C-alpha cells in the first residue's frame, strides 16, 4: 500500500471584501498517496487554484491543516524546494537562460551536482520532444515548447508531489498526451503524486482519481 504524503484536513478559505465575507472553500478534505494521479475539475472561479496554493504551502487556509507526514523539513520554503514541484499555465521561464539552464536551476539552488543535473534535465527534455532545443533561449521557443520546459523544470528535483495548474492549457493534443505519459511514468517509477487542475475532461478521466470542486466542497466526480 502506498504511503500517504499529503493531507488537507477541514480546509476553509474565506476572504473579506468590504463588509462581505467571500467563502471560497469550506471544510474541504483530501488525502493524497504516493504515486497517485489526481485531477481536479470545476468551473472558473470555483477555488481550484486557491486549493492548489494552499496544498503547495503558498497560501494559508482560514481554518484547517495542511499535513505532510514524514517530511524531514519543517520550514515551508524548504518543503517547497525539496518536496514539491509546481507547474502553472504561464511558464515563468528566465528569458536570459537557455531551456537547459532553466530546467537545472532548481537543482543548482538545492546545491546538488551540476553534472548529474544536466544529465537528468537533458533526459527529461528529450522525453518531452525538446532534445534539439536544449540551448535555445525562451524567445526562440513556441508557447507550447516553453510550457514543456516549465514542466521539465518541475520534475528536475524529483519532487514527492507535483501541483499543476492547467499544465496543458497551451498545448496541442499530441503534446498533451506526451505530457500525460511523462506524468504517468514519473508517478509509477518515482512514486511522485501529481495533483492537476484542468479543464481538459479527456485528460482528467485518464487520472487515477477525479474530483470536482463545487459549492466550495471537493467530491469524487
UniProtKB/Swiss-Prot annotation:
- Specify the superkingdom: Bacteria
List its EC numbers: 7.6.2.-
Q: Which residues form the ABC transporter domain?
A: 6-220
**Top-level EC class, please?**
translocase
Membrane topology of this protein: Peripheral membrane protein
One GO cellular component this record assigns the protein to is: plasma membrane
Q: What keywords are assigned to this protein?
A: ATP-binding, Cell inner membrane, Cell membrane, Membrane, Nucleotide-binding, Translocase, Transport
Single Gene Ontology MF annotation: ATP binding
Q: Which residues bind ATP?
A: 42-49
According to its UniProt record, where is this protein mainly located?
A: membrane
**Entry's SUPFAM superfamilies?**
P-loop containing nucleoside triphosphate hydrolases
Recorded coiled-coil stretches: none
Cellular location of this protein?
Cell inner membrane
Its annotated function is as follows: Part of the ABC transporter complex LolCDE involved in the translocation of mature outer membrane-directed lipoproteins, from the inner membrane to the periplasmic chaperone, LolA. Responsible for the formation of the LolA-lipoprotein complex in an ATP-dependent manner.
Q: In which family does this protein belong, per the annotation? A: Belongs to the ABC transporter superfamily. Lipoprotein translocase (TC 3.A.1.125) family.
Q: Describe the subunit structure.
A: The complex is composed of two ATP-binding proteins (LolD) and two transmembrane proteins (LolC and LolE).
* PANTHER family assigned: ABC TRANSPORTER ATP-BINDING PROTEIN MG467-RELATED (PTHR42798:SF2), LIPOPROTEIN-RELEASING SYSTEM ATP-BINDING PROTEIN LOLD (PTHR42798)
Protein name (database record) = Lipoprotein-releasing system ATP-binding protein LolD
Identify the gene encoding this protein.
lolD
Amino acid at each position: 500500500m502506498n504511503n500517504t504524503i499529503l493531507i488537507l484536513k477541514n480546509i476553509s478559505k474565506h476572504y473579506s471584501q468590504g463588509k462581505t465575507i467571500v467563502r471560497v472553500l469550506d471544510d474541504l478534505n483530501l488525502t493524497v498517496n504516493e504515486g497517485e494521479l489526481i485531477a481536479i475539475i470545476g468551473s472558473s472561479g470555483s477555488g481550484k487554484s486557491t486549493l492548489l496554493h494552499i496544498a503547495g504551502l503558498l497560501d494559508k487556509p482560514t481554518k484547517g491543516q495542511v499535513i505532510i507526514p514524514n517530511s524531514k523539513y519543517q520550514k515551508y520554503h524548504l518543503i517547497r524546494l525539496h518536496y514539491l514541484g509546481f507547474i502553472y499555465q504561464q511558464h515563468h521561464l528566465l528569458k536570459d537562460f537557455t531551456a537547459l539552464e532553466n530546467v537545472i536551476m532548481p537543482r543548482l539552488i538545492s546545491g546538488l551536482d551540476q553534472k548529474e543535473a544536466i544529465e537528468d534535465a537533458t533526459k527529461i527534455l528529450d522525453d518531452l520532444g525538446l532534445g534539439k532545443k536544449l540551448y535555445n533561449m525562451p524567445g526562440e521557443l513556441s508557447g507550447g515548447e516553453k510550457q514543456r520546459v516549465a514542466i521539465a523544470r518541475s520534475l528536475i528535483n524529483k519532487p514527492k508531489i507535483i501541483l499543476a495548474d492547467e499544465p496543458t492549457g497551451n498545448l496541442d493534443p499530441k503534446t498533451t498526451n506526451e505530457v500525460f505519459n511523462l506524468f504517468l511514468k514519473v508517478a509509477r517509477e518515482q512514486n511522485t503524486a501529481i495533483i492537476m487542475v484542468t479543464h481538459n475532461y479527456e485528460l482528467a478521466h485518464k487520472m487515477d482519481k477525479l474530483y470536482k470542486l463545487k459549492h466550495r466542497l471537493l467530491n469524487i466526480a
